[in-house]
Amino acid sequence: MLLNMNLQELKQKYNYDVATKMMQQYLDIKFAHLDCLLLFRMGDFYEMFYEDAILASNVLGIALTKRGKNGEEEIAMCGVPYHALENYLTKLIEANYKVAICDQLETPEEAKNRGGYKAVVTRDVTRIITPGTIIEENLIASAEPNYLASLVIPKNKETASLCYVDLSTSEIVVVNVPETEILNELARLKPREILLSENLRSSNLADSIFKQLNLRITYQVDSFFAINKCEKIILDFYKMKDIKGIGEISSSQICAIGSVLEYLSLTQKQNIPHLPIPRIIKFHSYMTIDFSTRRNLEIVTNSQGGSQGSLLSTLNHTVTKQGGRLLYNFLSSPLTNIAKINHRLNITEFFYSNLEIVKKIRELLKKTSDIERCLTRITMNRSSGRDLLSIKYTLETATIIKGVFFDAYGFNLPDFIEKIIKPLSGDAELYNLIDETIREDAPNNLNDGGIIKHEYHPKVAQLHDLINNGKLYIEKLKDQYRKETGIDSLKISHNNVIGLFIDITAKNVNKILDPKFIHRQTTVNHVRYTTAELQKLESELVNAKTLVISLEKELYADICSQVIEKASYLRILASSLSGLDVFCNFAYIADEYDYVKPEFTDDLSFDIVKGRHPVVEKALQRESKSFVYNDCHLSELERIWLITGPNMAGKSTFLRQNAIIAIIAQIGSFVPAKSAKIGVVDKIFSRIGAADDLIKGQSTFMAEMLETSAILAQSTKNSLIILDEVGRGTSTYDGVSIAWSVLEYIHDKLKCRCLFATHYHELTVMSNFLPALQNYTIAIEESGKDILFLHNIISGAADRSYGLHVASLAGLPASVINRAEQILLKFEKTSTGKGKNILSTESNNLSLFYLEPNKTTISSKLDKKFRTIDPDKLSPKEALELIYELKKLV
């Protein structure tokens, strides 16, 4: 509502003309930031007023108070302490609010000196915090990126451009994305905030981004993405004369990059960190995994959006934050280039063959810091001395890590390992700069002082000497004046009116002969003096704290500027350390969980021997149970496995584990199997399970058909398709027909690898005329009416689904199971196609939902009733009533 008002309407609403000067200042700033919650610094608190206060008090759970009236309207107010700001910001950002931080740009004393005692302290917004522009350690997940993305769709709409930046690490990337893959790419990146043109607000794309992916969209006017404007922004930011300095980029990529930089400038108030030139990547350089498949396979999050039970949580034994983020990126973007995959696998194999080195390196890596994010805070003037110390300790540890390699291999390291550890040699100049300037006990807050080593700068040493030894200097001056005057009782005292003064008794006045003693005050029994020396000392003592903090800030800024000059090296070092962490992690889990190096081919092989599902296996291990491994042998000649068998037997686990093995292999890790030979997979599609999507108005069947349609449209010969129960959301005949035709299409048109699980046993006859389709089933062991699921995949087809057995395991009443067996028997005795007639006959005689009384049921009820009777406590009347009740029951 406020966004639709003009300035005059806003002033009228808030009684601007009769507001105090301070409140007018607040309103001026608020009117310029209507889309934000405004946190207004007042002394030691950030205050919020009017509607902002009401919203914030609810979100933060803090008291809502009032700050007088503005005209007739009471002003709602709430506030948070400045030192606890980050704790409250977390809640506001999680609630999807943009927050404008308005700080005091001068002290109250400076304001008085400028404009008298009525002057209002100058304030302004120093930054705007949005989900995609956070850098505070406490506000962002340390083990995953925090992307801000800008999506630009040109008029031809065939290819969109996407630029994404992680402000906390200074990573910036641009990519062209086919229009059909936009949602999949956004699902891969999971940006915290997406910039989108206002023209797309009512589009299907915007609706899908918000509803299907649950991502936050920040709309901007169309001119925000104008090509000429964006090109100028890029040239100015990178100090270039020609846009070709970025590389070969399209017009829409220019708009995407420029709009991201402009948004950062607006939210960070020009205080943008040093960003490298955007990295231009090719869309098809990594495996395509659509958003539905990512959800089904629980790659980086579980089905509820948490981390526990995800593939990432199972594989993540990294020991650094930056290593965790790199592993997250690896899993989100598996490679599709065989050479690059094998390069990673060779690195993993090296560390797997050197587990003693891995153990030492992992212990050392724990001592390193997240220097990517330290560097960002430094470049944005939001760092502390501890950020510099973190860089120093990391430089020191890096050289020790390199020494571990040298001790083991000398100069005989493989080239691919030498390339990784080359940056670990450190930078002696940078290390010495920090070591010589920053105190080991440097505080978090620059305003606390004590960050610069005293010996680094003589003035710092002098000022700290005054702060620490002020009383000693006063004592020395007192002793000097006693000697000069001969007055042994002379004192130097202090009060708030005249400050430091020399105090003598009235009887000693005649001994004060030197004119340097200046009379200040006379009382009944005492006379007070001062001197130029004492006034100078007092001034130095009073100002020492302020002066040293100011000087330390100046020196600290200079040190930071020298660190920023080393930004490129520090980013390379961070990349090296995170890479070491991830590959040592791969070696660790390969050893810990018995993983094997996969082999890659350029054909359609998918030959997995004794494969296992890593997440399920780990869960079973916690219960001291073993996972039942299975083989999977897909090839040019046997591309499709049609898998039949009962529920709960392990079909879905088998389907998922093979998709997961492909993903793990193509990130460069060993895999949970005895052996694995894989033709590179360019896309993985998984349609496993469904639930009615009531929010989007889609039934289970519609959701299933939409996903299946997308799979058939986007798959290529090199894709891997995982389908479970296609067609189950409709009638049996419709379902069988759809599943049948889908299988034919995959076999004849796509010719890709596919695992297809179904309850439609009618489909198994397709192996007679589709040469690349083979039937497989789940092994079971029967004993009378009981069956045991063996969880083994074997060649052949299931003759029934064992659904009644599963229903019994689920706890359905015995009477329901018995009745179901009766009806099933009649179906099985009737030829295919007459089931409908049986159902009709049954419904005429007896409802399918009517439970015919039987002796077992009656006996059970009587037994239950008799157990509640105590004959000794029944009165004659109660006994008679009980007899009638039992007769009625029978």
Curated annotation (Swiss-Prot):
PROSITE patterns: DNA_MISMATCH_REPAIR_2. SUPFAM superfamilies: DNA repair protein MutS, domain I, DNA repair protein MutS, domain II, DNA repair protein MutS, domain III, P-loop containing nucleoside triphosphate hydrolases. GO terms for biological process: mismatch repair. The keyword Cell cycle does not apply. It holds the Pfam family MutS_III. ATP binds at G645, P646, N647, M648, A649, G650, K651, S652. Keywords: ATP-binding, DNA damage, DNA repair, DNA-binding, Nucleotide-binding. Coiled coil: none annotated. CDD domains: ABC_MutS1. GO terms for molecular function: ATP binding; ATP-dependent DNA damage sensor activity; damaged DNA binding; mismatched DNA binding. InterPro entries: DNA_mismatch_repair_MutS, DNA_mismatch_repair_MutS-lik_N, DNA_mismatch_repair_MutS/MSH, DNA_mismatch_repair_MutS_C, DNA_mismatch_repair_MutS_clamp, DNA_mismatch_repair_MutS_core, DNA_mismatch_repair_MutS_N, DNA_mismatch_repair_MutS_sf. This protein is involved in the repair of mismatches in DNA. It is possible that it carries out the mismatch recognition step. This protein has a weak ATPase activity. Belongs to the DNA mismatch repair MutS family. This is DNA mismatch repair protein MutS. It comes from Rickettsia africae (strain ESF-5).
